[in-house]
């Protein structure tokens, strides 16, 4: 009897109940003209309250820049179906380091790269038009970029883009590129690897990278969340490290984000895309004490007020009184905009 009680107690601790939470947005951005899809955030190092939200308008062929009040501060048109977007810090360019925004330009089969001016808070196109093509040699949907996540390698500051596409094979769905500055102050791409298993059901769009811990996560939308090393030169770069998030989802697995905390602590977030009330599944960033790649048990399930969410982004950086513990940004389909959620402490199960 004693052994059975011990085993039952251990099992209960290992499978602690998942918290069910209900969040409402603190604010929202202005609407885009066409169809909002994916957000990113740039943290202003001088004044975090003047940080920027960047969002794609895929049918409006534009990239929007918002302040934290949701006001449009810049619109960049002429981008042929921008699907997803990400931000990275510290690209060496023309003798200085530059923070960048990179978006997939699906109908042009390339990436669009922008420098962020930290003084004017405006974006400037620095794409090398002859060197930004992705999925070269592929055809149709296999050449159409969708998701993107940027990775800055800690040991040398090299910046990479991990890119997903509309369709792809079972074993190399994602391609990874190094961002290489040119003598003329532009940025071109250098392909470094193909990787990423795919179930064959649906597609892979959402990708996220944990810069600090060096992992890339992506959503195989009707199957689960997969994890690899982000460094293409890692000895186990081709090894699938984890598959999780296979249970409980009612809709497609869409946006993915990382909410980092001290050390290796924090959360991995993935959207369960639902009409009117998309849900966010929250997993432990650090895994378990026995296995850092074990993310099977969700910490929380957050019910939100966002409709049919595709892309999400999160930050734990304090952003002033409105967002003292950071925020969660979620695409909101019905209103063609992005919801801003004040991050709230999660119960410690």
Model-predicted regions and their roles:
Residues 83, 242-255, 290-319:
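Conserved blade-ending motifs and adjacent loop-strand segments that build the rim/top face
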Residues 110, 115-159, 164-165:
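Asp-box/WD-like beta-propeller blade repeats and closely related beta-sheet repeat scaffolds
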């Amino acid at each position: 009897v004693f052994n059975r009680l011990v085993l039952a107690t251990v099992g209960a601790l290992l499978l602690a109940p998942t918290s069910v939470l209900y969040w409402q947005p603190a604010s929202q951005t202005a609407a885009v003209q066409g169809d909002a899809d994916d957000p990113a955030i740039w943290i202003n190092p001088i004044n975090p309250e003047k940080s920027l939200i960047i969002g794609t308008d895929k049918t409006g062929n534009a990239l929007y820049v918002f302040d934290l009040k949701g006001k449009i501060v810049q619109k960049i048109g002429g981008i042929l179906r921008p699907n997803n977007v990400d931000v990275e810090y510290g690209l060496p360019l023309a003798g200085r380091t530059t923070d960048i925004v990179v978006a997939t330009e699906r109908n042009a089969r390339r990436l669009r790269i922008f420098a962020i001016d930290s003084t004017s808070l405006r974006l400037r196109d620095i794409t090398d038009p002859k060197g930004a093509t992705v999925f070269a040699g592929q055809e149709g949907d296999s050449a159409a970029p969708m998701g993107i996540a940027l990775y800055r390698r800690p040991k040398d500051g090299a910046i990479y883009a991990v890119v997903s596409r509309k369709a792809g094979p079972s074993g190399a769905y994602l391609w990874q590129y190094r961002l290489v500055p040119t003598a003329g102050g532009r940025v071109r791409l250098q392909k470094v690897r193909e990787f990423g298993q795919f179930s064959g059901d649906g597609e892979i769009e959402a990708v996220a990278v944990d810069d600090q811990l060096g992992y890339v996560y992506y959503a195989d939308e009707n199957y689960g969340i997969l994890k690899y090393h982000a460094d293409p030169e890692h000895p186990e770069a081709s090894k699938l490290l984890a598959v999780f998030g296979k249970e409980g989802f009612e809709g497609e697995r869409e946006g993915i984000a990382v909410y980092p905390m001290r050390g290796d602590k924090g959360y991995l977030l993935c959207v369960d895309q639902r009409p009117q009330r998309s849900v966010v599944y929250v997993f432990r960033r650090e895994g378990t004490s026995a296995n850092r790649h074990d993310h099977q048990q969700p910490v929380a399930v957050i019910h939100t007020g966002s409709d049919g969410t595709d892309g999400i982004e999160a930050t734990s950086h304090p952003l002033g009184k409105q967002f003292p513990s950071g925020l969660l940004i979620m695409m909101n389909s019905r209103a063609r905009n992005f919801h801003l959620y004040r991050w709230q402490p999660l119960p410690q199960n």
